[in-house]
A protein has these predicted regions:
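Soluble oligomerization/assembly scaffold segments of membrane-associated complexes
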Residues: 2-172
Length: 173
């Protein structure tokens, strides 16, 4: 049994029913859904309408084939995590499901680690700025400026990592 997909039973009761995910956890939801339909245009339109209603967007698109031999499309769709389950249901109603695989990734520890590092670096930057204001000579000032530059680089790097995690958590794929 799985909780929102994947290979885990986390989030399941003894009876096998889903529990609401812990809002404090930072979970990335991913699904790979294959659909088929003899009505390509209407199924595609229905799926894109469900995506718009869920507040999602097309991240990438690839299509091919012909009306004579069959057309296909492969989309990478981003859906707000709180709309993930209802969007999958709507998507499955737009055509016949041929396969579905789902996975989850709990990135709570990574997220907490990035936040802790950012807090530590912000405190370090503040202390270095205080020291810079008290620098007695040019040599000390240059050394402090060098350290500030390194700390700022690390802050920007961790801020970028946090933004990526936030995006992956907020929008399921």
């Amino acid at each position: 049994a799985s909780s929102w997909g994947g290979d885990t039973t986390e989030g399941m009761t003894d009876e096998g029913t889903l529990l609401a995910p812990d809002p404090a956890r930072k979970i990335i939801y991913t699904a790979d859904l294959s659909l088929e339909s003899t009505e390509f245009d209407s199924a595609s339109a229905s799926l894109l309408d469900a995506l718009a209603q869920a507040g999602g967007y097309v991240q990438s698109s690839e299509s091919g084939g012909s009306t004579e031999y069959g057309r296909w499309v492969r989309w990478s769709l981003r859906v707000p995590a709180d709309q993930y389950r209802s969007f999958l249901t709507a998507a499955e109603n737009s055509a016949s499901r041929t396969s579905l695989s789902e996975s989850t990734e709990d990135v709570t520890a990574d997220y907490v680690d990035v936040e802790a590092r950012l807090n530590s670096l912000e405190a370090q930057r503040q202390r270095l700025e205080e020291l810079r204001a008290q620098a007695a000579n040019l040599e000390d000032l240059l050394a402090i400026e060098n350290q500030l530059t390194q700390v700022q680089y690390q802050i920007e790097s961790y801020t970028g990592q946090k933004r990526v995690l936030d995006d992956q958590i907020t929008y399921s794929t």
